[in-house]
């Protein structure tokens, strides 16, 4: 009847309005991170009544909005502020890594944003990834630190094998030695580390091509800085 048609029309137009607002927010965010987030607050998409609410809404925006600038997402997630760190937590928690190989999980995670260039930002991002992966696969690792150091080791391997600025690469024996030195423990198959090595050797993790990220990944080779 007429009332149903009116309700349908209003619903469709409300959806169109929301879509337009999100498109506008994406454009503003891509131009300037702060302005984009302020706009999202102005249209009621971000509830900033508490830190947790605000962080959850920003994480949802990052995960569910198409055509966002990946460099800006990575830059925000890497910042050393309460809001960025809490957003990174909920951003990582939005992934489901249960029963997924850790290399595949890293591929999924790193496709959604551009790794920032600063080492400390990179550390925080890998830490939150590994924490989520550990929580989703608690029987695989003996502790959360093992998940973190293995994740870091994989990124080192990626850099050593596929960054043209690294001349000598890394052998399986060298990779395994790094992991043993970091006392990585878990319920692993005998060929677990060699399988990871071969995956990265044959099919590198796809990373956005930005010189700043390349330089940051090169710094990972200085493992002693992490310890």
Segments the model singles out, each with a brief description of its role:
Residues 1-132, 139, 148, 159-227:
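Catalytic and GAP-homology cores of small GTPase regulators
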Residues 137-143:
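A short glycine/serine-rich beta->alpha loop
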């Amino acid at each position: 009847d007429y009332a149903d048609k009116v309700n349908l029309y209003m619903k469709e137009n409300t959806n169109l309005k929301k879509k337009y607002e999100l498109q506008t927010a994406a454009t503003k965010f891509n131009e300037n991170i702060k302005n984009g987030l302020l706009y999202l607050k102005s249209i009621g998409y971000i509830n900033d009544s508490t830190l947790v609410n605000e962080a959850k809404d920003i994480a949802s925006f990052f995960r569910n909005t198409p055509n966002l600038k990946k460099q800006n997402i990575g830059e925000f997630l890497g910042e050393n502020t309460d809001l960025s760190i809490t957003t990174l937590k909920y951003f990582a928690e939005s992934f489901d890594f249960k029963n997924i190989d850790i290399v595949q999980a890293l591929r999924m995670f790193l496709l959604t944003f551009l790794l920032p260039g600063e080492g400390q930002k990179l550390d925080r991002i890998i830490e939150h990834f590994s924490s989520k992966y550990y929580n989703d696969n608690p029987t695989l690792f003996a502790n959360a630190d093992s998940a973190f150091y293995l994740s870091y080791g994989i990124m080192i391997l990626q850099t050593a094998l596929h960054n043209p600025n690294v001349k000598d690469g890394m052998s399986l024996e060298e990779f395994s030695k790094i992991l043993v030195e970091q006392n990585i423990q878990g319920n692993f198959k005998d060929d677990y580390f060699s399988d990871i090595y071969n995956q990265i050797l044959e099919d590198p993790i796809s990373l956005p091509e930005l010189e700043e990220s390349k330089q940051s990944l090169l710094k990972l080779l200085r493992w002693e800085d992490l310890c």
